[in-house]
Amino acid sequence: PPRDTAPTNFKILVPVMANDLSNAAAAGAAGDVVELRLDALSILDAPNVQNVLCAARAAIGQGVPLLATIRTKKEGGLADLTDAAYGELGTAICHSGLADLLDVEANTAPAAITLPRLRPPKRWSTP
């Protein structure tokens, strides 16, 4: 059955490329969630990712959820990472406390990431 898409349940996600945060504040004002595409960074390591997450959080404020995404080349993104490096970055993002959500690639993550479960997963209910 189709999901309830009434206006009260509908959310707008606005993507922002991490190599250009100039529009991050506008994205935070325009959407319900800001997706930060970290795979656009020229230096894709934990310290740089943390610095960019801090800058993005400062730009969009605390009231808007921040979704961190690292899309690998094999999934159509820009990041050329091994599964181990992908897992290390995902774990660093999770532990940083700077992102509210982490986009995990289904074809990469099971083999690469063991993220701590910070809270029980939400279960989708069907009508």
For each of these PLM feature ranges, what is it?
Residues 1-23:
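N-terminal amphipathic alpha-helix/helix-capping segment at the start of soluble metabolic enzymes
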Residues 7-9, 71-73, 120:
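Generic N-terminal leader/processing signal
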Residues 8-12, 30-32, 62-66, 98-100:
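Short, well-ordered coil/turn segments that N-cap beta-strands
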Residues 15-17, 33-44, 86, 90-127:
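Catalytic beta/alpha-barrel core
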Residues 20-32:
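N-terminal segments that cap or nucleate solenoid repeat domains
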Residues 21, 75, 126:
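Flexible, glycine-rich phosphate/dinucleotide-binding loops
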Residues 24-27, 52, 112-115:
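A short acidic, amphipathic alpha-helical/loop segment
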Residues 47-98, 108-110:
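N-terminal active-site wall of soluble small-molecule enzyme domains
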